[in-house]
From Swiss-Prot:
Record family assignment: Belongs to the RNA polymerase subunit omega family.
Biological process, per Gene Ontology: DNA-templated transcription
Keyword annotations: DNA-directed RNA polymerase, Nucleotidyltransferase, Transcription, Transferase
Protein name, entry field: DNA-directed RNA polymerase subunit omega
A Pfam family it matches: RNA_pol_Rpb6
Gene that encodes it: rpoZ
SUPFAM superfamilies: RPB6/omega subunit-like
EC nos: 2.7.7.6
Alphabetical list of InterPro entries matching this protein: DNA-dir_RNA_pol_omega, Pol_omega/Rpo6/RPB6, RPB6/omega-like_sf
Subunit architecture: The RNAP catalytic core consists of 2 alpha, 1 beta, 1 beta' and 1 omega subunit. When a sigma factor is associated with the core the holoenzyme is formed, which can initiate transcription.
Reaction catalysed by this enzyme: RNA(n) + a ribonucleoside 5'-triphosphate = RNA(n+1) + diphosphate
Keyword Flavoprotein: no
GO cellular component: DNA-directed RNA polymerase complex
Organism: Acinetobacter baumannii (strain ATCC 17978 / DSM 105126 / CIP 53.77 / LMG 1025 / NCDC KC755 / 5377)
Entry keyword Ligase: no
Length: 92
């Protein structure tokens, strides 16, 4: 599929607003969580791949029920590890 149209995606999602939610969640999964795409990547950005997956029916609104990975935990771990540095003499 060379181009993805909104109409192609709306065959599988109820409305444009839900399409935005589904596509953004799937794009985040592809970009940040390392999920494997169900269509060929073709050097596209994650948002384009997400829309292509929706257009062919591989991704549906059921994705909205999935829980996202907690990135705050990893940020907290990072903050705790930097806290172990010697910061004497600095005021916070």
């Amino acid at each position: 599929m060379a181009r993805v149209t909104v109409e192609d995606c709306l065959d599988h999602v109820d409305n444009r607003f839900e399409l935005v939610l589904v596509a953004s969640k799937r794009a985040r999964q592809l970009a940040r969580q390392g999920m494997e795409p169900t269509v060929e990547w073709d050097n596209d950005k994650p948002t384009v791949v997400a829309l292509r997956e929706i257009a062919v029916g591989h991704v549906t609104k059921e994705i909205l029920k999935q829980r996202e990975q907690d990135y705050q935990t990893s940020s907290l771990d990072l903050a705790l590890s930097t806290n172990s540095l010697n910061l004497e003499g600095f005021s916070f």
